């Protein structure tokens, strides 16, 4: 989110909610939006193929056909340009490529947009008028925008709308995605994506790879390390396996790639792809063929039947640490009960696995000096040690510590 939830609720004069059933999926923020409409008279526009709860409070409901988000947004921006409601000063001072952008938008006149989306021409004009004349307006979206094959383009088009209107960098404006689960933001911040290290430092960057290689004690790419397998036989490990130069696979790529022989093992943590990913029959077929599957979970799932190894994790009530919420607020949590049975916190399981892998390596790969490689050993005593590493290597988390969060 470019603006905080309090900022949006207290300063926005208009709200555009698209692809988000906010009161159901984000009830706290949804309640804040409803209060803003009822108590401050904020103008609310909802764009959703369904009639959701927020529609009861909306000035307009744009009930467009599924998958026509870009056409809808381009059509609205056509009208904004036609009526001269764009923020010319903001565009001149802060935007690039306006002529190319305008040429694209002008391909979506209201009649064509209405035909594509199913939204009447009159409703399009009323929505564009609110957007163009009531400032500032906050744009809010969730999985209904991102979970598409054109999800990135959907988001870029929403950003174009806000730049066209000059609603960026102001209280009550901005582009505000609501994340799908409570710590999705934190997982992404920590590099839980195929193309970045923690804090969105690109894996394709020589500088970023060198930074993490030094901190984690990994050699340069042209150096090799020896390892021994369980029978004591030597084999060669290329350190680029740990510091990749190329962007990795997404979830929707790695599982189908099993059938193509490109994925041989899966380590799944807190996820049930059989139920969550599209085409369940295809996912089952892939998991039946994978050479090795490790599943780290807190309860049996549809995916459990395909696991070669099951590792018992813990629930939120059994672990301490931090969550980063949708507005990037870092919050401390403390365990309420001790882990049950053989279950362990996820960080302990991961660290123990890493230590056992590192035990197979020689110093040709791993620097043992704490000065040259301060985070090479996975020797964490608590989650506060992990946070210390995070704020040392992830600039956006610099200065954050458990001690400060406790205050």
Show the residue positions of the predicted features.
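Cofactor-pocket helix-loop regions in the catalytic cores of large enzyme subunits
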Residues: 1-183, 187, 197, 202-225, ...
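Conserved N-terminal structural segment that caps and organizes enzyme catalytic cores in eukaryotes
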Residues: 191-192
